[in-house]
């Protein structure tokens, strides 16, 4: 007697990711994830990272690569990384300066006050890397001011243990980094997006690199690798035997080209 076919219900999984063009085939249903009935949430990456590491709000989500590394090293990550990278960027476009402070090159940032939305954001880690390797500017050479880009009262989502010579101050609770750069309270801002004072054409705010795309191209030609900024993460509460999860996700994802 023939056996009745076993019908397995698809998993209902919440998936949070930035609104990238390369993700649209998954979000629009053009590409299906095997064994999964996804509920997609397109959100700002910063919100995703905060909710993921503070509250583990999602089954699958885009994760800050540096934040994931810090949490994993501490043994407290609620997610397991999947080696697919939704966002890669060269971050030479991530440094915005006051152009009335005598800052002609990265070396001139020494002794300055630089705003960052979070010290350990992957974009900021990459920037600190090439500032030190290419220009000799160490993290201890500046004063870091942590705060919200456009909203006041932003919190660091994870606890950091920094070297004693690295100074990180909190921005005033009533101030934003964009506002402080516009008013001259900061000499520069580093972050994954342009502050509104820059996009609105403030005359005293500009890129550090006069041609940031050209600087990024030169960097890539010299070193021949791109920078991964985010990865997929699957909730650690899911057993690896569950329909091969998270195996279906990498199968249907493609990392962007450098």
From Swiss-Prot:
Induction: Induced by phthalate and repressed by glucose.
Any GO molecular function: 4,5-dihydroxyphthalate decarboxylase activity
Reaction equation(s) it catalyzes: 4,5-dihydroxyphthalate + H(+) = 3,4-dihydroxybenzoate + CO2
Biological process according to GO: phthalate catabolic process
Pfam families: NMT1 (PF09084)
Keywords: Aromatic hydrocarbons catabolism, Decarboxylase, Lyase, Plasmid
Entries under InterPro entries matching the protein: SsuA/THI5
SUPFAM superfamilies the record matches: Periplasmic binding protein-like II
Biological pathway: Xenobiotic degradation; phthalate degradation; 3,4-dihydroxybenzoate from phthalate: step 3/3
EC number: 4.1.1.55
Family: To P.testosteroni DHP decarboxylase.
Protein name per UniProt: 4,5-dihydroxyphthalate decarboxylase
Organism lineage string: Bacteria, Pseudomonadati, Pseudomonadota, Gammaproteobacteria, Pseudomonadales
């Amino acid at each position: 007697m023939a056996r009745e076919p076993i019908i397995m219900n698809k998993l209902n999984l919440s998936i949070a990711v930035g609104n990238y063009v390369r993700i649209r085939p998954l979000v629009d249903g053009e590409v299906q994830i095997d064994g999964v009935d996804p509920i997609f949430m397109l959100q700002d990456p910063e919100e995703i990272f905060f909710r993921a590491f503070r509250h583990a709000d999602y089954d699958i989500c885009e994760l800050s690569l540096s934040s994931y590394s810090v949490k994993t090293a501490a043994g407290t990550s609620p997610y397991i990384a999947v080696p697919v990278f939704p966002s890669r960027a060269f971050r030479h476009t991530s440094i915005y300066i006051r152009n009335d402070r005598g800052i002609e090159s990265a070396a001139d940032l020494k002794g300055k006050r630089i705003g960052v939305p979070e010290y350990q954001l992957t974009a900021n880690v990459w920037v600190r890397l090439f500032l030190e390797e290419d220009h000799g500017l160490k993290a201890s050479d500046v004063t870091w001011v942590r705060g919200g880009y456009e909203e006041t009262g932003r919190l660091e989502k994870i606890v950091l243990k920094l070297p004693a010579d690295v100074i990180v101050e909190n921005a005033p609770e009533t101030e934003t980094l964009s506002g402080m750069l516009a008013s001259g309270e900061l000499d520069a801002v580093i972050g994954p997006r342009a502050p509104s004072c820059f996009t609105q054409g403030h005359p005293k705010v500009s890129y550090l690199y006069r041609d940031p795309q050209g600087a990024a191209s030169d960097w890539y030609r010299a070193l021949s690798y791109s920078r991964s900024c985010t990865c997929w993460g699957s909730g650690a509460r899911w057993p690896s035997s569950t329909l091969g999860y998270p195996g279906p996700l990498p199968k249907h994802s493609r990392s962007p080209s450098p």
